[in-house]
């Protein structure tokens, strides 16, 4: 399928994990990609995997409004925005440090807000789509993820606001909510000491399998495409039945 032929698609967090898989999926479907990450080395690796020579890569800290504003100043076309960039940390809630709280909220939630805010004029012109990566942590109860869960809950709520506010103008805004996925961010995390291992079962899919980022990328591609034209303002769980 070439659902994104000649479409300009922007993917944040494209240096690894779900972001990289999404970029490769979009590339395979004909998109002209703009891929973004804060990690230049990993971003270059992703860029080297893309077949479309019109695609570009940009190192960008999405949590810095001046940098985001400058980036969008020279952008004149956009058909889809896919916000994947995010960070994760595990702590007992009473031990969360304020600097860690602020950093996670700034990248995950505020960064997503900045990207959407500056992309909106272009997306309204193209009647495009926004897909924000939220999490099953936004919808269920995940231990040790106070800041992360708060940030992802905010993304889900913010996305619904955009869907209602701009849906009449032809913009679709949806969230994908993955459960545990095999990515560099979630593999071998630093967990708090002396955790109750029974709580780990509450963040695992029914079959106990951490799926590939490719399975999230295919869902993102669907929501960003015209196949999902009548889907707006949803949290699409890709969680293996975790929250069922």
Q: What residue spans do the PLM features occupy?
A:
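Alpha-helical segment proximal to the catalytic Tyr-Lys
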Residues: 121, 164-168, 229
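Catalytic Tyr-x(3-8)-Lys segment
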Residues: 194-215
């Amino acid at each position: 399928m070439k659902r994104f032929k000649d479409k300009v698609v922007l993917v944040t967090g494209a240096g690894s994990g779900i972001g990289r898989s999404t970029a490769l999926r979009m590339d395979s479907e004909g998109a002209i990609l703009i891929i973004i990450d804060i990690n230049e080395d990993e971003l270059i690796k992703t860029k080297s995997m893309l077949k479309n020579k019109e695609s570009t890569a940009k190192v960008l800290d999405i949590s810095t409004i001046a940098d985001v504003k400058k980036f969008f100043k020279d952008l004149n076309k956009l058909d889809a925005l896919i916000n994947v960039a995010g960070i994760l940390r595990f702590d007992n809630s009473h031990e969360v440090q304020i600097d860690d709280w602020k950093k996670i909220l700034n990248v995950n939630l505020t960064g997503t807000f900045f990207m959407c805010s500056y992309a909106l004029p272009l997306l309204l012109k193209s009647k495009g789509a926004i897909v924000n990566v939220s999490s099953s942590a936004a919808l269920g109860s995940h231990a040790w993820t106070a800041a992360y869960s708060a940030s992802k809950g905010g993304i889900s709520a913010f996305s619904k606001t955009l869907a209602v506010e701009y849906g009449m103008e032809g913009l679709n805004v949806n969230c994908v909510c993955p459960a545990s996925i095999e990515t560099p961010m979630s593999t071998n995390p630093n967990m708090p000491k002396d955790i109750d291992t029974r709580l780990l079962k509450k963040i695992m899919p029914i079959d106990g399998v951490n799926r590939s980022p490719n399975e999230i990328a295919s869902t993102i591609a669907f929501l960003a495409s015209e196949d999902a034209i009548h889907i707006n303002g949803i949290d699409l769980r890709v969680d293996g039945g975790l929250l069922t």
